[in-house]
UniProtKB/Swiss-Prot annotation:
Low complexity biased stretches: 68-80, 91-107
GO molecular function, one term: RNA helicase activity
Sequence motif: DEAD box, positions: 268-271
Motif extent (Q motif): 118-146
Positions with biased composition (Basic and acidic residues): 505-517, 525-534
Domain notes: The Q motif is unique to and characteristic of the DEAD box family of RNA helicases and controls ATP binding and hydrolysis.
Lineage: Eukaryota, Fungi, Dikarya, Ascomycota, Saccharomycotina
Gene Ontology CC annotations of this record: nucleolus; nucleus; small-subunit processome
Protein keywords: ATP-binding, Helicase, Hydrolase, Nucleotide-binding, Nucleus, Ribosome biogenesis, RNA-binding, rRNA processing
Protein name as it appears in the record: ATP-dependent rRNA helicase RRP3
Domain Helicase C-terminal as annotated: residue spans: 347-492
Species of provenance: Candida albicans (strain SC5314 / ATCC MYA-2876)
Domain Helicase ATP-binding: residue ranges: 149-320
Length: 534
């Protein structure tokens, strides 16, 4: 009211000038208000607006109060979010900005030291688990098993590093099953794998090791029916083996499914799981599982990302490094062959003839090369099957099963088959296309010479591959011996037939491609996270 009177006095002074005491007496509040309304009306201000001006102070106070409350709420939410991020921030972006791991928090074990145990009986495992181990003919533990399992049984987080084919799966499955035997809790462990094939094989290992203790397991991967998987999850399996995208789909959409009581998290082939395609799904998974859990990271190689991941998600982990960063098996014979690009298919067919009857994996760089090369081999009478990311899940499993059962002795694959797959007794690996990085080379040739067997790898090097090949030699620390090429007259005679077969293979590949795409493309989604080839 005082403020309004001051405004009226100012307006009145403009009209009447200086007010005398007598005039002041005449201008009672009622008269003043009447004069004020007349003045305001002349300026286009209504009585209703005057009333709103009177309430201006109280409105401002209310707005300020609401603003303060909102600010306090926002600060509280921000504080909660910061706390949550501190506990769960395990995304790729956070890993890239975090500092490197300090060596004081990790115990690196000398791989040349004497094994901690030489038989599984020394571990005091439960009888049911020992029975399964014996039925699987596991007589002597591998180095990674000997070093990792004792620490895992003590409840420690593990970073396990070992060359492919060294028994990593059993190294984390045995401690989990030992703990499960005492708890018998549903949704006890989650194992994340980068590819569908690896997920199925991990499940097979768990099923075999847990066969005597009533283990329930489930494999949740893309390319399979969501409803069938949801029903499987409602049966409350003890162990879930999954690809990140599909398990996240179920966490978001399958009613009644939760991992809030999860005890074990395993990331197999951890470096690949940390690739960009898996980042968003991994971030969400790590936010919905308990902070208090046991975590195992297993990989064939060590990367900076894994070093940083242990700082973000593991508690006082033990690093079990059984092999160096880049190492091939001692019983693997590696060689290379310099070839003219125009004769590459001819050389390949010559090698397939040379190793007739042996189990062979031919690695290519792209899906198109894998499909075309498999067709080329089939046209020329070889039992070859393709394996790549653009096949349906049933087709991929079909190719794998044919190769593993010796119905087909040649598997033509992209790098989707290079890591983690349990393919026993591969005699020869042929790098039709040399890989673009050294790690991929290690994983490819690691498909042979497994579990103490001998093996052979041959890389076909064209004039366009020399730079990549020299990088691989630099990492290996040695030069690969050159493989002798067949005589020119033999190659020329074979080249005529291979050329015709190649043309037919290209035609059939185009037909398959057109049929698969149906004249159009398709959008990539989380279920395709393990389809890394183009």
């Amino acid at each position: 009211m005082t403020m309004m009177n001051e405004k009226l006095k100012k307006e009145k002074k403009k009209i009447f000038g200086v007010i005398t005491p007598f005039q002041k007496y005449l201008y009672t509040p009622r008269i003043i208000n009447t004069v004020h309304l007349i003045i305001m009306s002349s300026k286009g201000i209504t009585k209703k607006k005057v009333k709103s001006l009177k309430n201006l102070d109280s409105t401002k106070k209310l707005a300020e109060k609401i603003k303060q409350q909102a600010l306090q709420k926002q600060q509280k939410q921000q504080k909660q979010q910061e706390q949550e991020n501190a506990n769960h921030n395990q995304t790729e972006s956070s890993l890239s900005s975090s500092s490197s791991t300090t060596s004081s928090s990790i115990t690196t074990i000398d791989p040349d030291a004497e094994l901690k145990f030489k038989t599984f009986k020394e571990l005091n495992l439960v009888p049911d688990l020992l029975e399964s181990i014996e039925s699987m003919k596991f007589t002597k533990p591998t180095p990674i098993q000997s070093e990792a399992i004792p620490h895992a049984l003590e409840g420690k987080d593990i970073i396990g590093l070992a060359q492919t084919g060294s028994g990593k799966t059993a190294a984390f499955a045995i401690p989990i099953l030992q703990s499960l035997w005492h708890a018998q809790q549903p949704y006890f462990a989650l194992v994340l794998a980068p590819t569908r094939e690896l997920a199925f094989q991990i499940k097979d290992t768990f099923d075999a090791l847990g066969s005597s203790m009533g283990l329930r397991s489930s494999c949740i991967v893309g390319g399979m029916d969501m409803m069938d998987q949801a029903r499987d999850l409602m049966r409350k399996p003890h162990v879930i083996v999954a690809t990140p995208g599909r398990i996240m789909d179920h966490l978001e959409h399958t009613k009644g499914f939760s991992l809030k009581n999860l005890k074990y998290l395993v990331m197999d082939e951890a470096d690949r799981l940390l690739d960009m395609d898996f980042g968003p799904a991994l971030d969400k998974i790590l936010k919905v599982i308990p902070i208090k859990r046991t975590t195992y990271l297993f990989s064939a190689t060590m990367t900076n990302k894994i070093e940083k991941l242990q700082r973000a998600s593991l508690h006082n982990p033990v690093r079990v490094a059984v092999s160096s960063k880049y190492q091939t098996a001692d019983n693997l014979v590696q060689s290379m062959m310099l070839v003219n690009d125009g004769y590459k298919n001819t050389i390949l067919i010559h090698l397939l003839n040379e190793f007739m009857g042996k189990s062979i994996i031919v690695f290519t760089r792209t899906v198109a090369h894998a499909q075309r090369t498999a067709l080329l081999a089939r046209i020329l009478g070889f039992n070859a099957v393709p394996l790549h990311g653009q096949l349906s899940q049933s087709q991929r499993l079909g190719s794998l099963n044919k190769f593993k059962s010796n119905q087909a002795n040649i598997l033509v694959a992209t790098d989707v088959a290079a890591r983690g797959l349990d393919i026993p007794s591969v005699d020869v690996v042929i790098n039709y296309d040399i890989p673009t990085d050294s790690k991929a080379y290690i994983h490819r040739v690691g498909r042979t010479a497994r579990a103490g067997r001998s093996g052979k790898s041959i890389s076909l090097i064209t004039q366009y591959d020399l730079e990549m090949y020299l990088r691989i030699e630099s990492v290996l620390g040695k030069k690969l011996p050159k493989e002798d090429k067949p005589p020119k007259e033999v190659l020329d005679a074979l080249h005529v037939h291979v050329d015709k077969a190649t043309a037919e293979a290209i035609r059939q590949t185009k037909e398959i491609h057109d049929k698969r795409n149906g004249g159009g493309g398709r959008r990539r989604n989380r279920d395709d996270a393990d389809r890394e080839e183009r």
